[in-house]
Design a protein with these regions (language model features):
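Ferredoxin-reductase
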Residues: 48-128
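An N-terminal, well-structured beta->alpha segment
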Residues: 1-76, 171-176
């Protein structure tokens, strides 16, 4: 039953990002699903000449691995990548998006979902497609565009991986 559930569809990306149980297959949160989503966000960013991203995480199972996967994909796409120094609450990521003047913020968290879940939220820092975000969560049509990019990615093996990013200083937490 669990194997069938793991491969019985895809997690859907929307304004709340992605959320689901940590498990294998396209209907779960795992490195492949996160990598595909990160690559789609990188493509979305490139289309709009957005070049910087800050990534945060909570302490849930898988969050650290998903952060690493995201940082590698974003770095490989040529983005300036910042990673928050440790597990932190989501509002710190939104604050850091503005404070670091990043174009995009990505938070690895399932928020209020059950503990066996994880998730992925996206924030925008500046003006994108005529909407001034200032570190707020995406709204339509950004979610639809990212979702279309996810659908267009057929293989992660062709996605370049980078290993260059900056760990944000703890001072950002004090400023928050």
């Amino acid at each position: 039953v669990e194997l069938r559930a793991s491969f019985s569809g895809f997690l859907q990306f929307g304004t709340a990002g992605l959320r689901g149980p940590v498990r294998p297959g396209p209907s779960g949160m795992n490195r492949a699903v996160v990598g595909r989503t990160a690559a789609a966000i990188a493509a979305y960013m490139k289309e709009r000449q957005l070049t910087s991203v800050v990534i945060g995480r909570d302490a849930r199972h898988g969050s650290e691995d998903f952060t690493q996967e995201t940082a590698q994909i974003m770095s490989g796409a040529g983005m300036k990548v910042y990673v928050l120094p440790r597990p932190l609450p989501t509002p710190v990521l939104a604050f850091a998006t503005n404070e670091l003047t990043c174009d995009v913020g990505i938070m690895v968290t399932a928020s209020h979902n059950p503990p066996q879940d994880n998730g992925y939220k996206v924030y925008l820092g500046g003006t994108v497609d005529g909407i001034h975000y200032r570190g707020s969560q995406i709204v339509s049509p950004a979610d639809e565009s990212i979702s279309a990019h996810i659908d267009a990615i057929t293989s992660l093996s062709r996605q370049p991986r980078g290993h260059v990013w900056s760990i944000v200083d703890e001072e950002i937490v004090s400023k928050y």
